[in-house]
């Protein structure tokens, strides 16, 4: 159905399927429903399961507030890198070039930057220059501008604090600026779709796809196997999900089979 379009997975590069784990002080936050896990809260054990199931990459989002939790996260990354050999992206609380350096040295392949870059966009250029664009991901938490707020050109704005706080910055323009500053990838999370399980925000994906040439990861809204191919058709190079995988509502294999059935290349 989609194979005749100029798509990321139409005979070209394989579309990546990426589970995301929220980690707080070294523990997986959102409940996980795997059978036969010794410790469902251990991100390293979960990472190994997803690796075995055919995940193309993994994303860890560190939701810890404390500095002690940051040290714990580095240890989690180290342990994961010893056991899992697919690319690992780590985000959450990354504020400085030194933070990126620590995570990469611990074994992360890519580091996602969010709030700190909003305050200081040149940080992205510094990070890309020092570590290479391929290591730096701009994470954009986008939502429709609420009624009563100042409009943005695209109709979407960048948010912080888990989508609760608007910035007034145009989300599509911000993604484009990040690409111009040297990031290698955009992790595009729709705060409108997040948690709804009603499907990815296709209009947002199309808008960002038209504005950037770097890969775009679609995040937020996955709820059924049918939701993934339309995200690729809208321009996603990779699809990311959390709870549908953790609660065994869908497997990596089912998502890849659904993509392949639409003529989309998967690994």
From Swiss-Prot:
Organism of origin: Mycobacterium tuberculosis (strain ATCC 25177 / H37Ra)
GO biological process: L-histidine biosynthetic process
Record bears the keyword ATP-binding: no
Principal location listed in the UniProt entry: cytoplasm
Active site: 22, 141
Pathway where it operates: Amino-acid biosynthesis; L-histidine biosynthesis; L-histidine from 5-phospho-alpha-D-ribose 1-diphosphate: step 5/9
Entry EC no(s): 4.3.2.10
Gene Ontology CC entries for this record: cytoplasm
Transmembrane portions of the chain: none
Subunit structure: Heterodimer of HisH and HisF.
HAMAP family: HisF
Disulfide bridge positions per record: none
Keyword terms, alphabetized: Amino-acid biosynthesis, Cytoplasm, Histidine biosynthesis, Lyase
UniProt protein name: Imidazole glycerol phosphate synthase subunit HisF
Function noted in UniProt: IGPS catalyzes the conversion of PRFAR and glutamine to IGP, AICAR and glutamate. The HisF subunit catalyzes the cyclization activity that produces IGP and AICAR from PRFAR using the ammonia provided by the HisH subunit.
Family: Belongs to the HisA/HisF family.
The keyword Lyase belongs to this UniProt entry's keyword annotation: yes
Localization in the cell: Cytoplasm
Reactions catalysed: 5-[(5-phospho-1-deoxy-D-ribulos-1-ylimino)methylamino]-1-(5-phospho-beta-D-ribosyl)imidazole-4-carboxamide + L-glutamine = D-erythro-1-(imidazol-4-yl)glycerol 3-phosphate + 5-amino-1-(5-phospho-beta-D-ribosyl)imidazole-4-carboxamide + L-glutamate + H(+)
Enzyme class: lyase
């Amino acid at each position: 159905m989609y194979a005749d379009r100029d798509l990321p997975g139409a005979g070209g590069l394989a579309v990546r399927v990426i589970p995301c784990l929220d980690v707080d002080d070294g523990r997986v936050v959102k409940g996980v429903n795997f059978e036969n896990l010794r410790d469902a809260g251990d991100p390293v054990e979960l990472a190994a399961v997803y690796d075995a199931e055919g995940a193309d990459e993994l994303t860890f989002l560190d939701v810890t507030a404390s500095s002690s939790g940051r040290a714990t996260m580095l240890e989690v990354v180290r342990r994961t890198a010893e056991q899992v050999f697919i690319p690992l992206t780590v985000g959450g609380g990354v504020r400085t070039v030194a933070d990126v350096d620590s995570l990469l040295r611990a074994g992360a392949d890519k580091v996602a930057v969010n709030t700190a870059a909003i305050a200081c966009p040149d940080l992205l250029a510094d990070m890309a220059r020092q570590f290479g664009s391929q290591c730096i991901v701009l994470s954009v938490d986008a939502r429709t501008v609420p009624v009563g707020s100042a409009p943005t050109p695209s109709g979407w704005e960048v948010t912080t604090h888990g989508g609760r706080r608007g910035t007034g910055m145009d989300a599509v323009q911000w993604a484009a600026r990040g690409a111009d500053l040297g990031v290698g990838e955009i992790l595009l999370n729709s705060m409108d779709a997040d948690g709804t399980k009603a499907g990815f925000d296709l209009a947002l994906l199309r808008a960002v796809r038209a504005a950037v040439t770097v890969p775009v990861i679609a995040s937020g809204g996955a709820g059924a196997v049918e939701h993934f191919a339309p995200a690729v058709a809208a321009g996603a190079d990779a699809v990311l999900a959390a709870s549908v995988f953790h609660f065994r509502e869908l497997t990596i294999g089912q998502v890849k089979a659904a993509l392949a059935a639409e003529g989309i290349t998967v690994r």
